[in-house]
Regions:
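Short beta-strand segments
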Residues: 7, 79-80, 103-104, 127-131, ...
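Non-heme Fe(II) oxygenase catalytic core, chiefly the N-lobe of the double-stranded beta-helix
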Residues: 112-148, 153, 158-161
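Flexible glycine-rich active-site/ligand-binding loops centered on an Asp-His dyad
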Residues: 94, 101-105, 147-180, 219-223
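Short loop segments at secondary-structure junctions
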Residues: 20, 107, 137-141, 161-162, ...
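Structural signature of FAD isoalloxazine-binding scaffolds in flavoprotein oxidoreductases
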Residues: 95-112, 128, 261-271
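N-terminal non-catalytic cap/leader segment that marks the start of a structured domain
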Residues: 1-99, 264-266, 286, 293-297
């Protein structure tokens, strides 16, 4: 089953997608059944979410551009740094004994096909990081590795969009990786019963069509199950929480090649679809010609 959060004239709504996976991944227009929840996060927090997701509802047709972040307001977005062996080597870092965690705020999320706007002060070293995102489906606290996958609702894709110059100002990753509306997240949630390839799936990132990252999740140091075990030993993981599992080799920082104005990052994970975000230098301008601080944006 594939579940999406779709923008509407009144906000957002959760939708169960209809159709074959191959046609979904190649189409610009999608069809689905509207569910009685504002978004996929609200659905996951409802209790027996899998049963609720199968209920009948009104049919809906929408464009891929209408897709919102699949879980727009997670309670936690836990990101994992330095988790692909070859990426650690390209960054000249030591292999960690334990997962390296940092937090991304929900404000950083944007839709899987939304444009990204970066003010001039942040444009010096913009970087892409294609990553597998794991979405929790039921409360997990101090769970063992061998049972950890039972707590997964499903999987999606995230671009851990990074402002490297800001990131490198301190020893902490957070500031450079939580910039407002930069992290494409989606395109939808593929439920765990439909996709179980977390430890063996191809991750491919292109920049204006040129391949930059092309690796397999079997290069992960800490598996999805191990990450859930570790994170849940620190605090409860609740429905809708997201673990972003790290990026493979090929990031722009290692090449000294960064995202330029007007360039498009596309990230595809085998079996999960793709996300595609175009970067623009400067603030977005509304149809009225005003900027983001105008009263019409409040």
């Amino acid at each position: 089953m594939k579940l999406a959060t779709v923008k509407t004239a009144f906000g957002t709504t959760a939708v169960r997608l209809e159709g074959e996976a191959t046609s979904l991944m190649s189409s610009t227009m999608l069809t689905g059944i509207e569910l009685d929840f504002d978004d996929v996060g609200a659905l996951l927090r409802s209790g027996d979410w899998s049963k609720a997701a199968e209920l009948s509802g009104e049919p809906m047709v929408f464009a891929t551009e209408d897709l919102a972040p699949v879980v727009p307001q997670p309670e936690k977005i836990i990101c994992v740094g330095l988790n692909y062996a070859k990426h650690i080597r390209e960054m000249n870092r030591e292999f960690p004994e334990h997962p390296t965690l940092f937090i991304k705020f929900a404000d950083a999320l944007t839709g899987p096909y939304d444009d990204v706007f970066i003010p001039e002060y942040g444009t010096a070293k913009l970087d892409y990081e294609g990553e597998l995102a794991v979405v929790i489906g039921k409360r997990a606290h101090r769970v063992a590795e061998d049972e950890a996958l039972d707590f997964v609702a499903g999987y999606a894709i995230m671009n851990d969009y990074t402002l490297r110059d800001i990131q490198r100002q301190t020893s902490q990753f957070h500031a450079g990786k939580s910039f407002y509306r930069t992290a494409g997240f989606g395109p939808w949630l593929t439920t765990a019963d439909e996709w179980s390839s977390g430890n063996h799936a191809r991750v491919r990132t292109t920049l204006d069509g040129e391949v930059k990252q092309d690796d397999d999740t079997d290069d992960l140091i800490f598996s999805v199950a191990k990450l859930i075990e570790f994170c849940s030993s620190l605090y409860p993981l609740n429905p809708g929480d997201v673990i972003v599992t790290g990026t493979p080799e090929g990031v722009g920082f290692a090449r000294d090649e960064f995202i330029q104005d007007g360039q498009t990052v596309r990230i595809e994970i085998e079996g999960l679809g793709h996300i595609e975000n175009t970067t623009h230098y400067g603030e977005p301008v509304s149809s009225t010609g005003c900027g983001p601080n105008c009263s019409c944006h409040s």
